[in-house]
Swiss-Prot record:
Pfam families: YceI (PF04264). It comes from Enterobacter sp. (strain 638). InterPro entries: Lipid/polyisoprenoid-bd_YceI (IPR007372), TTHA0802/YceI-like_sf (IPR036761), UPF0312/YceI (IPR023480). This is UPF0312 protein Ent638_1570. Residues 1-22 form the signal peptide. Coiled coil: none annotated. The keyword Signal applies. GO terms for cellular component: periplasmic space. It is found in: Periplasm.
Length: 192
């Protein structure tokens, strides 16, 4: 009887731990359910907002084991859009993002840690030919089945970068030394 109970307990344990495995997701950019946005102060008087319209990426998510989570994103820096063509041209120039020489920015996570209900995602951001560690604070918005028979998970993340850290040395004034990153992604779980 004891062996039977032990077998049932072990079987239950294996079943429950087996169901909590990491799942791979592709960022849903085709459905326009993902955004890589930024904002920077303009002269300390207002916020200037922008977005990158062309990017791709994936993430691995295991709610029970954040150490297994991974994030990889590639951004086409030429897709920068601040809703002002002349400003966009200037931001794409060698004074700022130098998109002719560095057409892509990348983020690859190196560590994911639980922080209360949120996640701290640390990784290497490569921008303007410079790679630096960056930490993003992320929040799970929701996860579950979608109407098309798949599964989805969505996150919002935020962080800050200093322009000088990425060799962007144009002086925009003391209020404009940092850029806020505002990221919202929805991922479609990939079938194994």
């Amino acid at each position: 009887m004891k062996k039977r109970l032990l077998g049932i307990a072990l079987g239950s344990l294996l079943f429950t731990t087996g169901s909590a495995v990491a799942a791979d997701y592709k960022i849903d950019k085709e459905g326009q359910h993902a955004f890589v946005n930024f904002r920077i102060q303009h002269l300390g008087y207002s916020w200037l907002y922008g977005t990158f319209k062309d990017f791709d990426g994936s993430f691995t998510f295991d709610e029970k084991n954040p150490a297994a989570d991974k994030v990889n994103v590639t951004i086409n820096t030429n897709s920068l859009d601040t809703n002002h063509a002349e400003r966009d041209k200037h931001l794409r120039s060698a004074e700022f993002l130098n998109v002719a020489k560095f057409p892509q920015a990348t983020f690859a996570s190196t560590e994911v840690k639980k922080d209360g209900e949120d996640l701290d995602i640390t990784g290497n951001l490569t921008l303007n030919g410079v790679t630096k560690p960056v930490t993003l604070e992320a929040k799970l918005i929701g996860q579950g089945d979608d109407p098309w028979g798949g599964k989805r998970a969505g996150f919002e993340a935020s962080g800050k970068i200093r322009l000088k850290d990425f060799n962007i040395t144009t002086d925009l004034g003391p209020a404009s030394q940092e850029v806020d990153l505002i990221i919202s992604v929805e991922g479609v779980q990939q079938k194994s």
